[in-house]
């Protein structure tokens, strides 16, 4: 098996396991363990907290240990977590289910950060856009399918079968990772500072690098806006738009279609368009999408909302693949884990703030005001790119040296 093929198979298995676990947790907690909304909220929060708690230390270890070994650790953790979750459901221990959720999500965090850091050593620089697109396509497809599969299992068998499928996905991913070449640690023992110092070095590199700083700020504003949109979507759809729950879900599902088509189109865009076009298009088309949501209450609510969700899937997926490639090229290999962890921590840290802001503004000033906030944040994400050197990036940068 070729190294990239092994990594692609591992990506499909890992994201399938992660998305099945995400979809299965609330079903298991509610239908099997009888958890109420308060306890369910704690379980979902625990699962989501892994990105904030684990990313920065994991990024440092990714730069210290052979990356294949880190992938094995991550997948073994995910596999164990799925098995423990089944045991928790069978015995009725909610705390054990929460611990399994944290462990499984932590394994996903380590896997994602490691795979992004490992990819530049497996493919030529010119193949990075296509390779990143294929990895993102695998993630998008399983993310779209997992909730439906989990729901069918819960309806016809038992919610815990979702964890069995998650364990199978993690096991298949582990088999693929074992086919990767051994590799060596990016940094040697004599070069290793303390954990805190190593994390600060990664943060400082992101702040000092003009391209990485622009990417990070754009992602922060965009994620703030998107999670504000998610927070107000149900009251917007069921209220001013007049949608029933089925049409509400159908409109939102176009987001997944946008992700998949964006991942499919990304290699062609990388060949035909200079990077700055894609980097501006992604956040700019999100402003257009926000305008569609603003106009939706005046008529054709379903069509406008569906088009809006499609655009915030399609354009930002193109942007994500392009910026990931730029990030991989400008970051030296010994810093790759910490740089990726810094960016991801900032993104996941701002998401709950966006959701909170969207909900508060909608409650205090109304849904139109919340939509204006969302439009403004998407516009800021575009402005950050336009004012940064990313807007002048006509070719991909040369790979950084260690």
Question: Where in this protein do the model-derived segments appear?
Answer:
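Helix-loop-helix hairpin linking two adjacent transmembrane segments in secondary transporters
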Residues: 138-176
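Helix-loop junctions on the cytosolic side of multi-pass membrane transporters
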Residues: 117, 121, 163, 169-193, ...
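C-terminal transmembrane bundle of multi-pass solute transporters/carriers
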Residues: 5, 52-64, 68-84, 95, ...
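Helix-loop boundary and gating motifs at the non-cytosolic
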Residues: 1-49, 204, 208-255
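Cytoplasmic helix-loop-helix junction between adjacent transmembrane helices
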Residues: 100-141, 147
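Residue-level signal for conserved functional micro-sites within the alpha-helical transmembrane segments
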Residues: 18, 22, 48-55, 108, ...
């Amino acid at each position: 098996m070729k190294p990239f093929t092994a990594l692609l198979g591992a990506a499909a298995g890992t994201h399938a396991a992660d998305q099945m676990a995400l979809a299965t947790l609330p079903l298991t907690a509610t239908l099997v363990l009888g958890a109420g909304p308060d306890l369910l909220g704690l379980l979902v929060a625990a699962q989501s907290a892994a990105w904030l708690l684990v990313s920065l230390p994991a990024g440092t270890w990714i730069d210290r240990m052979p990356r294949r070994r880190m992938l094995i650790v991550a997948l073994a953790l995910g596999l164990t977590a799925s098995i423990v979750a089944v045991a928790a459901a069978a015995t009725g221990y909610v705390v054990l289910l929460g611990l399994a959720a944290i462990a499984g999500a932590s394994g996903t965090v380590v896997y994602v950060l490691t795979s992004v850091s490992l990819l530049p050593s497996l493919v030529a620089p010119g193949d990075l856009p296509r390779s990143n697109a294929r990895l993102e396509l695998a993630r998008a497809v399983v993310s779209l399918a997992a909730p439906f599969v989990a729901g069918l299992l819960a309806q016809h068998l038992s919610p815990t079968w979702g964890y069995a499928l998650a364990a199978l996905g993690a096991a298949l991913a582990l088999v693929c990772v074992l086919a990767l070449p051994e590799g060596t640690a990016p940094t040697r023992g004599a070069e290793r500072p303390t954990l805190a110092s190593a994390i600060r070095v990664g943060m400082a590199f992101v702040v000092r690098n003009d391209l990485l700083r622009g990417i990070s700020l754009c992602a922060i504003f965009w994620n703030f806006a998107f999670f504000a949109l998610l927070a107000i979507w149900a009251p917007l759809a069921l209220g001013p738009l007049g949608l029933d729950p089925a049409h509400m879900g159908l409109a939102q599902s176009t987001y997944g279609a946008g992700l998949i088509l964006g991942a499919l189109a990304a290699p062609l865009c990388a060949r035909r368009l200079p990077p700055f076009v894609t980097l501006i298009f992604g956040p700019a088309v999100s402003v257009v999408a926000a305008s569609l949501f603003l106009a939706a209450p005046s008529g054709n609510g379903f069509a406008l909302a569906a088009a809006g969700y499609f655009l915030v899937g399609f354009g930002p997926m193109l942007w994500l693949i392009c910026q990931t490639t730029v990030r991989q090229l400008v970051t030296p290999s010994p810093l790759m884990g910490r740089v990726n962890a810094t960016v991801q921590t900032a993104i996941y840290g701002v998401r709950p703030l966006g959701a909170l802001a969207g909900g508060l503004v909608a409650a205090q000033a109304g849904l139109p005001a919340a939509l204006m906030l969302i439009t403004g944040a998407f516009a800021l994400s575009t402005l950050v790119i336009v004012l940064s050197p990313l807007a002048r990036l006509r070719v991909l940068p040369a790979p950084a040296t260690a």
